[in-house]
């Protein structure tokens, strides 16, 4: 739909259906718009009209409430940082060490806070560093900040990560989980 056609639809067909709708009920407004269009691909009213009206309603609701627009998207107030996936061994395109998996990461499942999550990760990383040194390997880092030792296989890298988790006093898969970025597009 053209922009002028969208404006015409808003001023005629859409506005009539929205009169009396609660401006603070975004779900209801969007449902009215979707039902009014009636097509799966929104081809009757068109995205120019539907999106513009939906966004305008959301902005008006924020203005009436006297809050920043982004605050109208918040569902609850108990904010918390997500737990990190810590990159601890690099391979693939991020390191010149022969490993095919690009990133071996850990996720601190046991943590009850972000600071505890970071502490758990640092303990595992420190123990991984000690294990790498004990094996006579380099603790140089790859492009993404994980260690990039010359290890002969992905399995041996995983064994090292599991050993570091265990040495740190954690249980693999319970307290700390292993995550992989296999970068399949690079295989």
Mark where each language-model region is.
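Metal- or metallocofactor-binding catalytic centers and their adjacent structured scaffolds
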Residues: 1-63, 67, 118
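Flexible, glycine/charged-enriched surface loops at secondary-structure junctions
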Residues: 23-29, 47, 69-72, 129-147, ...
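Flexible, glycine/proline-enriched loop segments at strand-loop-helix junctions
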Residues: 40-48, 104-119, 145-152
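Conserved phosphate/anionic-ligand binding catalytic regions in large, soluble enzymes, centered on
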Residues: 41-62, 83-99, 143-147, 182
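Glycine/threonine-rich beta-strand-loop-alpha-helix active-site module
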Residues: 66-85
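Mobile "lid/hinge" segments at catalytic clefts and subdomain interfaces of large enzymes
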Residues: 79-142
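Catalytic core of soluble alpha/beta enzymes
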Residues: 155-187
């Amino acid at each position: 739909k053209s922009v002028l056609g969208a404006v015409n639809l808003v001023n005629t067909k859409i506005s009539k259906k929205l009169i009396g709708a609660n401006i603070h009920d975004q779900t209801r407004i969007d449902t009215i718009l979707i039902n009014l269009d009636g097509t799966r691909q929104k081809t009757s009213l068109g995205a120019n009209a539907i999106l513009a009206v939906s966004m305008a309603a959301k902005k008006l609701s924020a203005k009436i409430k006297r809050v920043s627009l982004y605050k109208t998207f918040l569902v609850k107030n108990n904010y918390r940082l997500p737990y990190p996936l810590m990159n601890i061994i690099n391979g693939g395109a991020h390191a010149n060490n022969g490993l095919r998996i690009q990133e071996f990461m850990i996720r601190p499942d046991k943590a009850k806070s972000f600071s505890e999550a970071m502490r758990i990760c640092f303990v595992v990383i420190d123990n991984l560093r000690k294990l790498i040194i004990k094996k006579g390997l380099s603790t140089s880092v790859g492009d993404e900040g994980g260690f990039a030792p010359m290890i002969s296989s992905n399995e041996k890298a995983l064994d090292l990560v599991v050993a570091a988790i265990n040495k740190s006093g954690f249980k693999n898969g319970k307290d700390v989980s292993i995550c992989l970025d296999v970068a399949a597009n690079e295989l």
